Amino acid sequence: MARKPASSQDFETTLVQLENIVTHLENGDLPLEEALKEFEQGVQLAKLGQERLQQAEQRIQILLQKTEDAPLNDYKGNDYEGNA
């Protein structure tokens, strides 16, 4: 039976659940009512996944904006020569 997706679950879990629903629906062996419930849950999971992707994109944009103000310096690494 279809369950309501938890809004706190991560993107990967959401994607796996959505893929499972798609597989069940593609098999075509579900009774109509169960197929409708699976479809409804799939729509909810797709929306949740889209929200997660949008949140990630916003976070990336914020991080990129912050780094525009602070240019990156070349990494020189640890200089162990001469420190022995």
Swiss-Prot record:
It holds the Pfam family Exonuc_VII_S. It is an enzyme of class 3 (hydrolase). Its main location: cytoplasm. It is found in: Cytoplasm. Disruption phenotype: Essential, neither gene for this protein can be deleted. Its EC number is 3.1.11.6. One of its GO terms (cellular component) is exodeoxyribonuclease VII complex. Signal peptide: none annotated. One of its GO terms (molecular function) is exodeoxyribonuclease VII activity. It catalyses: Exonucleolytic cleavage in either 5'- to 3'- or 3'- to 5'-direction to yield nucleoside 5'-phosphates. InterPro entries: Exonuc_VII_S, Exonuc_VII_ssu_sf. The keyword Hydrolase applies. GO terms for biological process: DNA catabolic process. Heterooligomer composed of large and small subunits. PANTHER family: EXODEOXYRIBONUCLEASE 7 SMALL SUBUNIT. Belongs to the XseB family. Bidirectionally degrades single-stranded DNA into large acid-insoluble oligonucleotides, which are then degraded further into small acid-soluble oligonucleotides. NCBIfam families: PRK00977.1-1, PRK00977.1-4, xseB. This is Exodeoxyribonuclease 7 small subunit. It comes from Haemophilus influenzae (strain ATCC 51907 / DSM 11121 / KW20 / Rd). The gene is xseB.
